[in-house]
A protein has these predicted regions:
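Short, charge-rich amphipathic interface segments used for partner binding and complex assembly
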Residues: 3, 11-59
């Protein structure tokens, strides 16, 4: 796996982690609508990371 591939994976993993932290904070503040949006964002980030990992490991 190239350096660029690792960078892309690290960025996707970072977004996944940050979206989870944001979700926790939004829940603490009882911002339900925003927490719902953030939960979808986190789920998308998980799928993105998993998809990138699978694709880049094939190459």
């Amino acid at each position: 796996m190239s350096r660029h591939h690792k960078t892309v994976l690290n960025m996707a993993k970072f977004i996944q982690g940050q979206s989870l932290l944001l979700l926790e904070k939004l829940n603490e503040l009882d911002l339900d609508a925003e927490a719902d949006m953030c939960e979808r964002l986190h789920e998308d980030a998980e799928r993105l990371h998993a998809g990138l990992l699978a694709k880049l490991n094939q190459e």
